């Protein structure tokens, strides 16, 4: 069994705890629980423990002043600021216990920052406070986290999005009926590289046959030129000749096929069925194209959406995204489409190859895409079933790694 410790326990029976090193907020805990993630130093309540409860995985929680040996002092970080000295924020008693190795320190972080850089920052502050760096452990959303000692990988979004969609009882099924759109391609937030991708998609006519969107861009701040998109330091796709395409695309954005607010679009419980049941393929513009200069893959709810809802997809994201999905047990569509783009390490070349695949799909009629729909049936149904399955095995693997750590 794994043990965790916290400075302030609200209710042992429900494992409700005040987040370690969280902001000092006023009010009843349930009224302020959503504010920790947006308030410095951005330490959240530990949702990993919720996952354990959902999967009937045993664990215990204890006071950090009186905990079993090898307990984990849990810090759930919503945003990793390298200027934050986490150990310097500990109370004197908690810091003393850390120095005396009465517990291990476990960070939980759902982003893809370079693991080695995070390690170096934490070790620097640990040395400052006379804490043994080997006491520090870190769970990351980067697929290469395991390459760094005492770092571990868990795809939090695979569990979080599944739970949210289950809560809203949202599930699209595969069907054989004709669909009116070739693609769904939804981009909620602007990024320089996403603008290049979207402009090129527009150039080859994708949005004419899609449920498409490009949102959260505001020209009132002077953002009305292409200068930001031709500098490789600002845009990893600067080598793609997209200036004219961007000029054309700038005239039509923002646009959306729905009237949802940005908050609603970002809500994991949200479900718009037609995006999956009335379009044949999903074009995914993931969160990252390059994962902090590493070879890591970063899979978020953007990819889990079509997987849950029985829809084939093309991923424009980090190198090896499809390979990583396969390592998790999912199947992709090589043989039906050319997925060699996934192995291209150069970002702009990978995107160009993915765009070529999308263009090839777009040349097909709705009738032809409906025929392909039968070819992908077994794959998408396998993926949806796997996604919806319990994640106990993934979580038990993580626990085993933590308990076997030095």
Language-model region placement:
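Pol beta-like nucleotidyltransferase catalytic core
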Residues: 2-284, 290-300, 307-406
């Amino acid at each position: 069994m794994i043990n965790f410790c916290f400075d302030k326990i609200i209710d042992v029976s429900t494992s409700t705890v005040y987040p370690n090193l969280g902001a000092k907020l006023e009010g009843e805990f349930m009224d302020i629980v959503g504010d920790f993630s947006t308030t410095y130093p951005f330490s959240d309540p530990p949702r990993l423990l919720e996952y354990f409860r959902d999967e009937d995985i045993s664990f215990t929680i204890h006071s950090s002043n009186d905990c079993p040996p090898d307990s984990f002092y849990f810090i759930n970080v919503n945003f990793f600021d390298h200027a934050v000295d986490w150990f310097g924020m500990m109370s004197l008693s908690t810091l003393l216990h850390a120095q005396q190795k009465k517990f291990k320190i476990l960070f939980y972080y759902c982003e893809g920052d370079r693991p080695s850089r995070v390690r170096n920052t934490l070790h620097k502050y640990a040395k400052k406070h006379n804490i043994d760096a080997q006491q520090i452990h870190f769970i990351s959303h980067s697929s290469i986290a395991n390459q760094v000692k005492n770092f571990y990988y868990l795809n939090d979004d695979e569990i979080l999005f599944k739970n949210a969609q289950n809560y809203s009882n949202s599930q699209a099924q595969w069907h054989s009926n004709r669909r009116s759109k070739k693609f769904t391609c939804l981009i909620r937030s602007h990024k320089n590289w996403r603008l290049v991708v979207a402009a090129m998609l527009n150039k080859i006519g994708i949005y004419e046959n899609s449920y498409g969107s490009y949102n959260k861009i505001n020209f009132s701040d002077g953002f009305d030129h292409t200068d930001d998109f031709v500098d490789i330091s600002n845009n990893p796709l600067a080598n793609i000749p997209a200036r004219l395409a961007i000029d054309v695309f700038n005239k039509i954005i923002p646009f959306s096929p729905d009237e949802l607010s940005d908050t609603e679009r970002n809500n994991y419980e949200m479900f718009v069925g037609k995006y999956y049941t009335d379009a044949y393929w999903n074009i995914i513009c993931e969160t990252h194209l390059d994962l902090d200069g590493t070879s890591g893959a970063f899979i978020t709810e953007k990819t889990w959406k079509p997987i849950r809802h029985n829809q084939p997809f093309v991923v424009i994201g980090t190198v090896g995204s499809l390979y990583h999905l396969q390592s998790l047990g999912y199947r992709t569509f090589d043989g039906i489409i050319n997925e060699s783009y996934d192995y291209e390490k150069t970002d702009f070349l990978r995107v160009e190859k993915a765009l070529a695949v999308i263009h090839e799909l777009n040349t097909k009629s709705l009738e032809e895409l409906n025929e392909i729909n039968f070819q992908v049936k077994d794959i998408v149904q396998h993926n949806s079933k796997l996604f919806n399955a319990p994640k106990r095995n993934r979580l038990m693997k993580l626990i085993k790694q933590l308990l076997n750590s030095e």
